[in-house]
Amino acid sequence: MSNDVKIGRQFLIDEFGVRSETIERFEHYHSLVLKWQPAQNLVSRETLAHFWVRHICDSSTLIKLNGPKGIWLDFGSGAGFPGLVTAILHKQLNADGPSSVVHLVESNKRKVAFLRTVIRETGINAVVHASRIEKFVENSDIKPDFISARAVTALKNLQVFSEDYVSKGSACFFHKGRDINGEIAEAANIFDFDLVKHIQALPGNRQSDGVIAEIGTIRRKTS
């Protein structure tokens, strides 16, 4: 077992009290990433060796902020961060059902197939929507409690996708880089919004690459 796996497993046990079956789901998720990686390039080569800390632990921060509850909408899910991690933790921490589900929006057909494989083989409560984000937003009647995104697009674009949901009570939690101030300034040309930056701390004395931007209100500016 690599040091990354040991640190990641212990973090999940310490922070969430996860049981063996949840660890096994994460292990199976990891094995599927390794299996699909050569053809799909699901994660960068630089972070693959630190999968548990850089991706699983990093994504789990959302549960620490909000608890295992509610309907989640994850934009541009890619390899499943943070959406699949959220759903795997929900499986144990909250009896998953209609009130606790993660909706993953992804347009890449191969990544859609990967996400559906993980969901099927781990038995988690998540749904994949094979769509571009803008098309999904136009046509969906889902009413999420929380919206997430990680390494997808600029903050201003995420706010465009999210503004109608937020007006109905949704809260946004976007993983962004530590250089987020430039994106905030750019978004402020279009929207008035309330934003809280949560600094992420990763286990094993690793420095996180970013912050989580929590947004509770989005109001489009009028000229």
What is the predicted role of each segment?
Residues G78, A151-A154, R178:
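Short glycine-rich anion-binding loops that position phosphate/pyrophosphate groups of nucleotides
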Residues V33, T86, K176:
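Residue-level signal for inorganic ion chemistry
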Residues Q37, H90, I119, A188-F191:
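Conserved hydrophobic residues forming the short capping helix/wall of the S-adenosyl-L-methionine
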Residues S60-A149, Q159:
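Conserved SAM/SAH cofactor-binding pocket of Class I
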Residues Q159-A171:
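A short glycine-rich, Lys/Arg-flanked "PGG" loop and its adjoining helix->strand segment in the class I
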Residues V101, N125-V127, A171, D192-L195:
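Conserved beta-strand segments of alpha/beta enzyme cores
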Residues M1-K69, R110-N125:
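Class I SAM-dependent transferase core
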Residues H103, G177-S223:
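Active-site capping/gating segments
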